[in-house]
Amino acid sequence: DEQQVKTVFEEVNPSVVIHCGAMSKPDECELDQPAALLNNVRGTELMLKYASVNQPHFIYLSTDFVFDGTKAMHKEEEEPLPVNFYGHTKLLGEKAVQQYAATWAVVRTVLVYGNPLGGRDNILTLTRKKLENKELFKVVNDQQRTPTFIEDLSAGIIAIVQRRATGIYHLCGKEMMTPFDMAFATAKYLQLDVSLLEKVTNNSFKEIAKRPLLSGFNISKAEKE
């Protein structure tokens, strides 16, 4: 809602904007592409439009899904190539942010996990729920990524705010893991029954949107700065 966006910027007059809102479920984006464009691209453009009045530092949260999954440890300067519509819309959002007249930063991250604080479930919370209910949990074991602990991501964003850092930044963990690896580690830590975890391949699920099989970022730029 453009009027709502306009009103918020006029009333709050922020010095920093952290734009993390998105339609972020790949299958939903694939099924309803107009809605994905409206939320992920048009929504971003509207925020940039009204931010440009007083020009706060603009931070945009993006994703490893802007890459095609043929290699890992991507650096910020590498050319994106999304393989699904969600990644496509996030890349369009990135490009819009890069045209912003004031200072901006794009923060790409990977498979965020931790306490959802009322948000949607992640691999850790799903593992706990399934295994505490004694349910079999089928978890993909042929997608490799560098998962991101939510508190590490938050600390990275705070550093960008404090330093008013600009440009593209990759913020994620250092260790390559599959979703199954994460679920197994969670179950072991919580002393839950790991025998309820079943390794499956990406093709086991009838997912509409293609997922990158190999992902993850080189975070040396963020570490240095």
Regions found by a protein language model. Name each.
Residues 2-39:
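NAD(P)H-binding glycine-rich loop region in Rossmannoid oxidoreductase-like domains
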Residues 9, 127, 157-161, 183-186, ...:
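Hydrophobic "lid"/C-terminal helical patch
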Residues 17-21, 58-63, 68, 107-109:
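SDR active-site strand-loop-helix element
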Residues 31, 38, 42-46, 66-107, ...:
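Catalytic helix-loop patch of NAD(P)-dependent Rossmann-fold dehydrogenases
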Residues 53-57:
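A short helix->loop->beta-strand "cap" motif at the edges of active sites that frequently abuts
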Residues 95-145, 152, 158:
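NAD(P)-dependent short-chain dehydrogenase/reductase
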Residues 156, 163-209, 213-214:
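Mid/C-terminal beta-alpha module of Rossmann-like enzyme folds, strongest
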Residues 210-225:
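C-terminal amphipathic/interface module of NAD(P)-dependent oxidoreductases
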